[in-house]
A protein has these predicted regions:
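Rossmann-fold NAD(P)-binding glycine/threonine-rich loop
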Residues: 54-65, 73-112
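C-terminal catalytic/substrate-binding lobe primarily of soluble NAD(P)-dependent oxidoreductases
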Residues: 135-396
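Adenosine-phosphate binding glycine-rich loop
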Residues: 88-161, 361, 366
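Residues in the short beta-alpha loop(s) of Rossmann-like NAD(P)-binding domains
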Residues: 6-10
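Short, conserved SAM-binding/catalytic segment
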Residues: 14-23
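N-terminal glycine-rich "phosphate-gripper" loop used for MgATP/nucleotide binding
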Residues: 28-30, 46-56, 67
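Conserved Rossmann-fold cofactor-binding substructure of NAD(P)-dependent oxidoreductases
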Residues: 25-42, 55
Length: 396
């Protein structure tokens, strides 16, 4: 098995050399991606896309046409796509980008396996939701039978009266040195976080909701499982909970799982929606990143030149990430990963707690895709949750 790394900048060069992986700095653009990738990608190959500002939709179609498998951790447009005002906010939202991928699912129903969003969240969060529902079913309904279809899963969530699903995350990792003035730090991709934090806030919108946000907007196309607000997610706070932190205020950052999970667990009678849970991300990053966000917002959303991913500098803390299922008979139930920096370093080199959770989700998705190479375009919710967790759990 041959591994090649194609990247837009030299970060990660030393790690690639350590593992004997060929490392090439060649940024992909709308103009050159076919020319660059055609010599590298053929039938049976696997393209793992962990970049930003590279169109997931274009790369997916490229791979399917060549019989190659594909996995991404989020659906990205080309550089500038998030801010292209010639396209409506609805069309360039995560909801709109997902609908473009859904169109490819219909276009290539029996193509090579493509999982456009499978890291930790989106990705593992979908499997934690399902395991959480099984556990609640055992406790509340006194049965733990695994649903056999998407419709069965949705009916189980409705029967349990789950109203809201949070992707709830609290990062308590601490680094030395910490954030400096005019520097943006984070425990994972600064560019990735800033990109999604600057996008309009998006959330799956449940049937139990009795009001509508003043700045809320509905989509006029697609599955209509989600809404968006006319302000950046990094400016919106929501209350959530994790076992170690307890209650906290997190940022309602747009994420693919908010849209796909609310869609997956929708119950319909004909064209009428009978049940759908509200679903959103509630993210409290590490405290140094919160300081970075405050500075970023205060500078009118202008990103400083200095950016740093906190990796070797982290000396304590953990990342708690999981599914918080709310509204049922038990009130609320959280199921997920509580990974400390010390555990992460014992499990895998060159990682912190956050990056290892993502890497575990990526690895599980890649293995499942290779075991099921002709499934077409799949949401994480379409992946076998038991197999995915079996693969990922040793690293969580």
């Amino acid at each position: 098995m041959l591994f090649r790394s194609l990247t837009g900048d030299p970060r990660g060069k030393d790690e690639a050399r350590h593992f004997g992986i060929k490392f090439n700095v060649k940024p992909l653009t709308r103009e050159n991606y076919k020319q660059v990738l055609e010599p590298l990608i053929g039938k049976g190959d696997f393209l793992l896309n962990l970049s930003v500002e590279v169109s997931s939709v274009d790369l997916i179609e490229f791979c399917v046409r060549r019989g190659a498998m594909y996995l991404d951790t989020c659906i990205e447009p080309w550089l500038g796509g998030y801010y292209d005002t010639s396209i409506s906010a609805s069309r360039r939202s995560n909801y709109g980008l997902r609908e473009e991928v859904v169109a490819l699912r219909r276009k290539y129903p029996n193509g090579s396996t493509v999982i456009p969003t499978h890291g930790a969240n989106p990705g593992l969060i979908s499997h934690w939701v399902k395991q959480g529902l099984i556990n609640l079913s055992r406790d509340i309904l006194k049965r733990a039978a695994k649903p056999e279809s998407r419709q069965d899963w949705a009916k189980l969530a409705m029967q349990l009266e789950v109203k809201t699903i949070h992707c709830s995350e609290r990062d308590t990792q601490v680094a030395n040195p910490g954030k400096r003035r005019l520097e943006f730090v984070n425990t994972w991709s600064v560019d990735g976080f800033v990109g999604e934090g600057s996008q309009p806030c998006e959330l799956g919108w449940g049937t139990h909701e009795k009001h509508f946000p003043r700045d809320g907007k509905q989509h006029k196309f697609g599955c209509k499982s989600a809404i968006f607000l006319t302000r950046p997610g990094a400016s919106v706070r929501v209350r959530s909970w994790t076992p170690g932190e307890g209650s906290f205020h997190g940022f309602l950052i747009t994420h693919g799982e908010a849209i796909s999970i609310s869609d997956y667990f929708t119950v319909r009678s004909g064209k009428k929606v009978m049940y759908r849970p509200t679903c959103h991300y509630a993210y409290h990053p590490c405290d140094n990143t919160v300081l970075s966000l405050h500075e970023y917002a205060g500078k009118n959303w202008q990103l400083p030149e200095n950016k740093r991913i906190l990796m070797d500098e982290v000396y304590e803390g953990a990342d708690e990430l999981g599914a918080l299922l709310c509204g049922h008979e038990k009130g609320a139930y959280w199921y997920g990963s509580r990974l400390t920096i010390h555990e992460a370093r014992k499990l895998a080199p060159f990682n912190n707690a956050t990056s290892l959770q993502v890497a575990a989700g990526v690895m599980a998705g890649v293995v499942w895709a290779m075991e099921n190479p002709l499934r077409g375009v799949c949401d994480p919710d379409d992946v076998d949750y038991q197999r995915a967790l079996e693969l990922a759990n040793p690293y969580l």
